[in-house]
């Protein structure tokens, strides 16, 4: 029993043992004396279950139980008073009705209360929906690759095995003194201004450029430019038209074109000195 004289719900005693000393009394006084609220005076958050263990429950909202006592009074006034041993099986639903009543009230409160969602929770839910929508979006199907033809693979293998042949040089025909002459087969001209023959560079379309002399300098290699990084001072130049005139002069003198032509004395006196990158 509790300090208030209320029996624990976890234990059950027969009706005869409970009302043993009250057989000669009226039933009305015992019920009024033992009538207590359905929730005991202790902490309502701790409730004892049928196995004797305490279960944590949410605290119920305060409600008035006067209407329940009024119905009980009407019910017990209708019962006959007997001196014989009464049947208390119908009068002891209190131990079982209190938990069921509390469960019904708890369920009723859950259905009636509609919790209001905060704005932050609503924003979080909308963000989750957006992320789920992005994640659930089906990716674009990749286009299937076309199967490679075996014939093309065989052709590629055959091409790799065959040595590449350099394309033939284009013939550059010039009419020298009425005679057509292919200058693409001529040896590369040289310049001997430094005392040693130095091959000239090709310049433009059919022209040549000196690698060792300018209008003021005669040295090999030419010095680097102080104004542009990675560039050398360019040598004197000769266009295709000027080179044709040189060939006409040498052909009239009977020069053997099997030997390289020395352009030392054939450079233009007004040669330009541009900056070019020589690799």
From Swiss-Prot:
GO BP annotations listed? positive regulation of response to salt stress; regulation of developmental process; regulation of plant-type cell wall organization or biogenesis; response to ethylene
Q: What is this protein called?
A: Protein BASIC PENTACYSTEINE2
Which Pfam families does this one have?
GAGA_bind
Tissue distribution: Expressed in seedlings, leaves and pistils. Detected in the base of flowers and tips of carpels, in sepal and petal vasculature, in pollen grains, in young rosette, in the lateral and tip of primary roots, and in ovule at the exception of the outer integument.
Hey, which family's this protein in?
Belongs to the BBR/BPC family.
Q: What compartments host this protein? A: Nucleus
Q: Which keywords annotate this record?
A: DNA-binding, Nucleus, Transcription, Transcription regulation
* Organism of origin: Arabidopsis thaliana (Mouse-ear cress)
Point out the gene that encodes the protein: BPC2
> What is the role of the protein in this entry?
Transcriptional regulator that specifically binds to GA-rich elements (GAGA-repeats) present in regulatory sequences of genes involved in developmental processes.
Principal place where this protein is found? nucleus
This protein's source sits in the domain of life called: Eukaryota
Task: Enumerate the GO terms in the molecular function aspect.
Answer: cis-regulatory region sequence-specific DNA binding; DNA binding; DNA-binding transcription factor activity; sequence-specific double-stranded DNA binding
Q: Biased-composition ranges for Low complexity?
A: 152-161
Naming one, the record's GO cellular component terms include: nucleus
Outcome recorded upon mutating residue 161 to D: In strain: cv. Shokei
Positions of region (Disordered): 126-167
